[in-house]
Structure formats: structure tokens, C-alpha cells
A protein has these predicted regions:
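Conserved alpha-helical scaffold flanking the Walker A/P-loop in AAA+ ATPase domains
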Residues: 174-178, 225-250, 266-274, 300
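Short, charge/polar-rich alpha-helical segments
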Residues: 1-44
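Walker A/P-loop nucleotide-binding motif
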Residues: 182-199
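Pre-Walker A (pre-P-loop) alpha-helix and adjacent loop at the N terminus of AAA/AAA+ ATPase modules
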Residues: 136-186
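Interdomain "pre-motor" coupling segment immediately N-terminal to P-loop NTPase/helicase cores
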Residues: 87-140
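Short glycine-rich substrate-engagement loop in P-loop NTPases that contacts/grips substrate
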Residues: 154-166, 208-246, 262
């Protein structure tokens, strides 16, 4: 999964802090117990000396295997003596052990060269946190997408807005369940407050849980940041071009609300075209109709969307207004 360098660095930093904290706490416990049980100091000195002797044995002994086996036997006996001493004084035999947040990998993030589950879960949490800073990701699930808010009346032989919403929800659940880096791109259309963002974020929730990297943002914010990056204005950027082009799933919300100029149009086309070429899925939402898109952008952008994306149109009344 192609997480950003920032996400990897943040996860590794958390692991490093966990390990450092566990090590310091273990040292504090050791100092406290050694002060209460002086015999522990004697055992620790003997164990340290055995460690040095084992190292020397490789270079000085005529029978290194025999001597190392003997030293290891002495070490095991001392370790057993230490456990018994702790028990005798009312402590568990592992009272001096380092208590890692993740005992499986000892807070390194890796087991036999492969990512530990704790590292994977950290990456997921960081992806989720980034989106939750700007959008209600936790609230937007398929379970909370209520189609009862859509009108149930059908006109001119068409299906009702409610039935349409139910079908789109079913399609989105299926899409999210089977999501991969090769999934098709989606294009949500419909008026304000009809659930386009909700469904996009519901898919994001599932994709993140499956271990995929996700970037969510409005067209205005993403294209604005990319324009600033292009002109060297690098302070406070949330989005960078290489991450936008490479992320497993890009969600571009509210297309058409951005400040339009020659650069943003060119940048938008590059995002759409590059990700189509790389077979990476993108979810775009807009309040515009296809005709309005043609008027606002050019034929190149609209034709790439209509030709390569699955079009999903929600109808009805502004749900946010109804909920009030």
C-alpha cells in the first residue's frame, strides 16, 4: 500500500516513542527493585560478566563450544535465581522485563522483516486521523446512510429518488467490499446535501480498514495547494502533487467550487489523466450536471470522466435542510 512518507514517518515516530518509554520505565523498575533487593545487583553483575566471557571465548578458548555451553548453563541458573528472588519478595518473575506496547514485535514494527499488525494499525489510524481533521469520516458509514430521507414518489415512469439512492448505496457497498487499487473510478452527481460526500467517506472508511491509503479533500483545497506547490509557496501544504497522483484512493469532493484558472484546469486534467493511466481509482463528486461540466471545463476533462468513471446520480431534496 502506498502510504505517504509523512504517514510512515509519523507511525515510526510513535513506535520509537513507545519503545523508549517502555525501556525507561523498565530501567526505573529495575533501579527501584535493586534498591529494595540488593542481591539482584550481585546477580546482574554476574550475568554481565558471563556475557563478556562468552564474547572473549570465541577468541581465547581452545574449546569454545564447551565453554560457551557451560557459561550459558551458569547464565540460566542465575536467571532462575533472579526469578525466585523476585517471587520471594512478592514480585512476579517478569517484574524486570520491558513491558512493550506490542510484545510481538517489541515496538519495532516488524517481525522477521514483515510489518507487524501494530504498525499496520498505526498506518490506518494516521490515515483516518488526517481525514477526520477536515471531514466527518467516523460518522459517514453505510450504516448511517439513511435512504428514508429521499422522496419515494416516481415520476414519468422513472424510479423514485429513494429507490435510486438504495441502488447507489448497494453499488457503493459492493464497490467498497471489493475495493482494490484496480477498482473503477466513481463520479457522484446531484444537488447539495444529497449524500455524495457521505457515500464517498463511507467507501474511504472501508478502504482504510482494508489497509489502503486514502486522500480526501475538496477540489478547492487540493487544487489550491497544488498551485501553491507549483509556484514555490510551500508553507502549510496539506496536499502535494506526488501524493495526489500516487495514493491508492483519491477522493476529490465538490468539483466546480474551486477558483478556476488555466493552471487549475490543467492540473485537474493531469490528476484525472495520470490516475486513469496508472489504473488508480478516484472518486469525484460535484453539484454540476454533465452539461454544466462541459460549460465550466473543457471537452477533455468531461470526456475523460464520462468515458472512464462510473456515473452515479443522486436526486431529491437537501437532506441537511430536512434534518434541521
Amino acid at each position: 500500500m502506498s502510504y505517504s512518507i509523512e504517514t510512515y514517518d509519523k507511525a515510526q515516530s510513535i513506535l520509537d516513542r513507545r519503545k523508549e518509554k517502555a525501556t525507561l520505565e523498565a530501567q526505573d523498575r529495575a533501579d527501584e527493585l535493586c534498591a529494595k533487593i540488593p542481591e539482584l545487583n550481585t546477580i546482574n553483575r554476574k550475568l554481565a560478566q558471563i556475557g563478556l566471557n562468552i564474547s572473549k571465548t570465541f577468541f581465547t578458548s581452545q574449546n569454545p563450544k564447551e565453554d560457551i555451553d557451560r557459561l550459558r548453563t551458569e547464565s540460566l541458573a542465575l536467571q532462575e535465581e533472579k526469578k525466585n528472588l523476585l517471587k520471594k519478595n512478592g514480585y512476579g518473575e517478569n517484574a524486570l522485563a520491558i513491558k512493550y506496547t506490542c510484545p510481538a514485535c517489541e515496538d519495532t514494527g516488524f517481525i522477521n522483516g514483515r510489518r507487524c499488525k501494530c504498525f499496520i494499525n498505526l498506518l490506518k489510524d494516521i490515515e483516518r486521523e488526517k481525514i477526520e481533521k477536515i471531514a466527518p469520516l467516523e460518522e459517514c458509514t453505510f450504516e448511517t446512510f439513511n435512504t428514508e430521507y429521499y422522496p419515494n414518489n416516481a415520476e414519468n415512469g422513472e424510479i423514485s429518488p429513494r429507490r435510486r439512492a438504495e441502488k447507489i448505496k448497494e453499488n457503493c457497498i459492493r464497490y467498497a467490499t471489493n475495493f482494490s487499487k484496480n477498482s473503477k473510478s466513481l463520479f457522484f452527481m446531484g444537488g447539495t446535501g444529497l449524500g455524495k460526500t457521505h457515500l464517498s467517506l463511507a467507501i474511504a472508511n472501508v478502504a482504510i480498514n482494508k489497509g489502503y491509503s486514502v486522500i480526501y479533500g475538496t477540489a478547492q483545497n487540493i487544487l489550491g495547494d497544488l498551485q501553491n506547490e507549483n509556484f514555490g509557496r510551500l508553507d502549510n501544504l496539506k496536499y502535494r502533487e506526488n501524493e495526489i497522483l500516487d495514493v491508492d484512493l483519491l477522493i476529490l469532493d465538490d468539483l466546480g467550487t474551486e477558483f478556476k484558472n488555466a493552471y487549475t484546469v490543467s492540473c485537474l486534467y493531469n490528476i484525472i489523466n495520470t490516475r486513469i493511466g496508472a489504473k488508480l481509482p478516484t472518486i469525484i463528486s460535484t453539484n454540476y450536471t454533465i452539461k454544466e461540466l462541459l460549460d465550466f471545463y473543457d471537452q477533455r476533462i468531461t470526456s475523460r470522466i464520462t468515458g472512464e468513471y462510473s456515473l452515479l446520480t443522486l436526486e431529491g431534496n437537501d437532506i441537511r435542510y430536512i434534518k434541521k
